[in-house]
Regions:
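Charged, amphipathic alpha-helical linkers/stalks
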Residues: 95-138
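Glycine-rich phosphate/pyrophosphate-binding loop
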Residues: 132-158
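Catalytic-core regions of glycoside hydrolase
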Residues: 1-105, 110, 149-156, 160, ...
Length: 167
């Protein structure tokens, strides 16, 4: 399936097919369904930010309504790729109502200190790029479509601001 968009996203009607199949399986199995979750960080390219918690945040409430028993997530410890989204995935599995944006607002100043503002801009731009992408594939050749040169230059400027704050 398309790992970049939630199954409620009207731009991608085939995601409704996936949701229909999931509903069918939970009915047939009387709710005894566990999802093998191939975390998106396994895709695109190692050490390229590739967040996926936004998709899970949009889908997890439906998983809870369907009575999904749990998840088995396959991922890796490539922190530039997985950074916060594995933490948020774990939190969302336990609490589908988690307010990720509120958590992020607390995270940036706690983790980055005086560099919080440029790092919030940096990560927000990355999250927005994945939210807004029309890319449905998930291999290395999509990198320029998600991270065009202009965006990479903007990301670089926020990293330089972060570096300046820490000097």
């Amino acid at each position: 399936t398309d790992p970049n968009h939630a199954f409620g996203d009207s731009r991608w009607p085939w995601k409704a097919d996936y949701l229909g199949a999931l509903r069918g399986w939970t009915r047939a199995m009387q709710g005894r369904v566990v999802i093998y979750d191939y975390d998106q960080s396994m895709l695109v390219w190692r050490d390229l930010p590739n967040p996926s918690h936004q998709v899970l945040q949009a889908e997890i409430k439906e998983h809870a309504r369907l009575g999904i028993l749990g998840f088995g997530t396959e991922s890796r410890n490539a922190l530039a790729t997985t950074f916060l989204h594995l933490y948020f995935r774990g939190q969302l599995y336990w609490n589908p109502q988690l307010d990720v944006q509120a958590e992020l607002k607390q995270f940036y100043p706690r983790f980055f200190g005086p560099a919080a503002a440029p790092m919030e801009a940096y990560w927000s731009a990355i999250y927005r790029a994945w939210d807004e992408t029309i890319v449905t594939e998930h291999e290395f050749f999509v990198i320029p479509a998600i991270y065009p040169r202009e965006m990479v230059e903007r990301l670089g400027s926020w990293l330089r601001q972060t570096d300046a704050v820490q000097q």
